[in-house]
Amino acid sequence: MNHIKDTLKIGSHTFASRLIVGSGKYKDFATTKEATLASGAEIITVAVRRVNIMDNKSENLLETFKDTNIQFLPNSAGCVNAKEAITLFRLVREATGIDFIKLEIIGDIDKTLYPDVIESLQATEILANEGFCVLAYTNDDPIMAKRLENAGASAIMPLAAPIGSGLGIQNRYNIGFIKEAVKVPVIVDAGVGCASDASIAMELGADAVLTNTAIAQAQNPVTMAEAMKYAVKAGRLSYLAGRIPRKAYASASSPLEGMMQFG
């Protein structure tokens, strides 16, 4: 397979990069932009409730990235039910014309930040029917992933570990099960702590990785962003190449034929 043409397709959108980055937790918009460009990402997600991308009277992310081709992905972080998220995205589309969205409805706002999948399922169906391209954040349940796909989700975004935890991929088998269960892209979201975590996610067969805290809170965000760029590429190529099977015992890499005989 020619990896040069190996693009990521989400709904009607096509991207060359399989890394998606967040915009939160940076010290300023300048660092956000520098790190995002270093990552090679073509999608940046922004929590509309925390950063008002619709405010034209002050510095905002839309203004910061206006000279780039980066696609904005508004998300509903902070929403706790379907009604809040639906209302938010309708306002976003009315103000910006953006209908490419990350649906994130949190069930446990105080501790785990785990998603409320029941509310998410309801919101996905309504928003998809209204023409939104819904990327649905969810838990690592392949049954729910399939239900979200059936409800109209254009991509499934299972968590790898709690948001911002940096614990890495805690559910390798479930990520694989989700990949088998759905036909839409699977984007590993939440829990990535370093570049190797992103690479592992891609080696498991994920179509893309979203990370924010691992870059924004790194000692050098720009350098970490570049590391993530290459990690995602390496993981994807490794997945496409096909790893060797795991074995319990050794297997010589050099042929035994023609060896010199002694004694």
Swiss-Prot record:
Keywords, alphabetical: Cytoplasm, Schiff base, Thiamine biosynthesis, Transferase
The name this protein goes by in its record: Thiazole synthase
Organism lineage: Bacteria, Pseudomonadati, Campylobacterota, Epsilonproteobacteria, Campylobacterales
The organism's place on the tree of life at top rank: Bacteria
Family stated for the protein in its record: Belongs to the ThiG family.
Protein function: Catalyzes the rearrangement of 1-deoxy-D-xylulose 5-phosphate (DXP) to produce the thiazole phosphate moiety of thiamine. Sulfur is provided by the thiocarboxylate moiety of the carrier protein ThiS. In vitro, sulfur can be provided by H(2)S.
Biological process annotations from GO: thiamine diphosphate biosynthetic process
Catalytic activity: [ThiS sulfur-carrier protein]-C-terminal-Gly-aminoethanethioate + 2-iminoacetate + 1-deoxy-D-xylulose 5-phosphate = [ThiS sulfur-carrier protein]-C-terminal Gly-Gly + 2-[(2R,5Z)-2-carboxy-4-methylthiazol-5(2H)-ylidene]ethyl phosphate + 2 H2O + H(+)
